[in-house]
C-alpha cells in the first residue's frame, strides 16, 4: 500500500460503521487515528484475515443502523434467501434517513442487539451472499477523484494477531473490477443526491421514494446486475 501525508483528513471514506463519508468528515478525524497509515489496492496484502472469525461475532452486534445496504446487497440477499425486499423490511432490515436520503440497513434486534441473520451459534446465516460492508470489514474505503482505495481500521476488529491476505481475496467478490466501478458510481450518486436535497429540502421525500423504487424495489431481471443498474442510473439523471 501507499502512505499519505501526516495530518491528511479523510473527507471521503467509508468505514462500514456509517454511510461514513460526510459523518466522519464532520468529525474531522485523521487517517492516523484509525488506520495503519497505508492505502491499499485490491492486489495488495493487508493484515485483515481474522481466522474465519472463530469464536467471535462482535462486529455482527451493536452496530445500530450503520450497516447500510446498497442495491446489489439487496439483490444478493433477496436471491439468496428467496425473500422479497418487502418481506425483508418486515423483520431483517429497516429504513433510516442517511444524510437526507432514506436507505435500508441491517436491523439489530434482541438483548444482544444482533443482526437478524446471526444464528444462535453466533455465525452468519447469509455468509455466501453477505453485504458489501460485511465483506469489507475491518477495511474501509478511501474515496478519491477516480474511484477509491482501501485502508485498514486498526481499532475496530477485536481479533488479535490477524494475518496477511490479499484485499481481493478478503472481499470475496466476483468480477471485482466491475464491483469497484459500481461502488464508486453509487457513492457518486448518493453524494449528488445529498447535495441536491440540501439545496432543495422540500424534495427530500420524493427523491428518497424515487431512489427506493428505482434501485431497490423494482426487481433486477438480469443475473449480471451491473449493466441493468447502470442503465437505471443513467435514467435517474433527469431527477437531479
Report each predicted region and the residues it spans.
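Short, positively charged and aromatic/hydrophobic N-terminal segments
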Residues: 4-17, 21
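Short loop/turn segments that flank or connect secondary-structure elements
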Residues: 22-86, 90-114, 118-240
Amino acid at each position: 500500500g501507499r502512505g499519505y501525508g501526516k495530518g491528511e483528513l479523510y473527507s471521503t471514506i467509508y468505514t462500514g460503521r456509517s454511510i461514513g463519508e460526510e459523518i466522519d468528515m464532520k468529525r474531522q478525524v485523521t487517517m492516523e487515528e484509525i488506520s495503519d497509515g497505508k492505502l491499499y489496492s485490491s492486489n495488495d496484502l493487508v493484515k485483515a484475515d481474522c481466522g474465519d472469525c472463530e469464536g467471535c461475532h462482535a462486529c455482527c452486534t451493536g452496530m445500530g443502523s450503520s450497516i447500510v445496504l446498497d442495491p446489489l446487497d439487496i439483490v444478493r440477499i433477496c436471491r439468496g434467501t428467496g425473500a422479497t425486499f418487502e418481506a425483508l423490511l418486515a423483520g431483517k432490515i429497516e429504513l433510516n434517513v442517511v444524510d437526507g436520503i432514506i436507505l435500508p440497513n441491517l436491523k439489530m434486534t434482541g438483548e444482544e442487539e444482533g443482526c437478524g441473520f446471526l444464528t444462535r451459534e453466533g455465525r452468519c446465516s447469509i455468509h455466501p451472499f453477505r453485504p458489501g460492508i460485511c465483506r469489507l470489514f475491518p477495511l474501509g474505503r478511501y474515496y478519491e477523484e477516480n474511484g477509491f482505495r482501501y485502508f485498514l481500521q486498526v481499532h475496530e476488529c477485536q481479533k488479535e494477531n490477524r494475518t496477511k491476505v490479499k484485499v481481493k481475496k478478503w472481499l470475496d467478490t466476483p468480477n471485482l473490477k466491475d464491483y469497484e466501478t459500481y461502488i464508486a458510481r453509487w457513492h457518486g450518486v448518493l453524494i449528488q443526491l445529498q447535495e441536491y436535497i440540501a439545496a432543495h429540502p422540500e424534495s427530500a421525500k420524493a427523491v428518497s421514494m424515487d431512489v427506493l423504487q428505482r434501485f431497490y424495489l423494482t426487481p433486477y431481471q438480469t443475473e449480471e446486475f451491473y449493466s441493468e443498474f447502470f442503465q437505471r442510473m443513467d435514467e435517474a439523471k433527469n431527477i437531479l
